[in-house]
A protein has these predicted regions:
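A short, surface-exposed alpha-helical micro-motif characterized by mixed small hydrophobic
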Residues: 107-109
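Conserved beta-strand-loop-alpha-helix hinge in the C-terminal portion
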Residues: 121-142
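H-loop/switch region of ABC-family ATPase nucleotide-binding domains
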Residues: 101-102
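Conserved ABC ATPase signature
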Residues: 44-48, 52
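Catalytic Walker B motif of ABC-type/P-loop ATPase nucleotide-binding domains
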Residues: 69-72
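Hydrophobic anchor residue at the start of the ABC signature
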Residues: 58, 86
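Conserved ABC ATPase "signature" region
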Residues: 22-40
């Protein structure tokens, strides 16, 4: 988030795709409403909570109509309510998601496949339940 307002941040991608301004505005409004921060569109990102910033960042991706969503520790620094709300948003996202996380509960709720990496090497590639139920494997790799 680097623009003066959330609206401008969310519009950045579609504008750089050279979409018509009416389409840009439509995508921005839809993305902001989808993540529940339409009322913040004219606010500076520098004055938002962590949860609001995460929602704004997600809106920037949604406005691009991305087919794959890559997330790095999406629930970090969120309070319990913000975490639940973000997970609900991600569950509703109908596209492929690649999530890097240490939040094992997030894996259980959100993922259909789990890949465990250690020192850049794949040590497991399985269903989330199978991975999360293997306590010896998790402990051996620092989880």
């Amino acid at each position: 988030l680097f623009c003066p307002t959330i609206c401008e941040d969310v519009a950045f991608g579609p504008r750089n795709m050279r979409l018509p301004e009416t389409e840009v505005r439509s995508r921005v409004d839809k993305a902001l409403e989808t993540v529940g921060i339409g009322h913040l569109k004219n606010k500076s990102p520098f004055h938002l909570s962590i949860g609001q910033k995460k929602r704004a960042a997600l809106a920037t991706v949604l406005s691009m109509d991305a087919h794959i969503l890559a997330l790095d520790e999406p629930t970090s620094n969120l309070d319990p309510r913000g975490r639940r709300e973000l997970i609900a948003l991600l569950e509703a996202f109908p596209r492929t998601q690649i999530v890097a996380t240490h939040d094992l509960d997030l894996v259980r709720h959100l993922c259909t496949r789990a890949v465990l990496l250690d020192a850049g090497r794949v040590v497991a590639d399985t269903l989330p339940e199978a991975l999360l139920d293997n306590h010896a494997l998790l402990e051996a790799h620092g989880l």
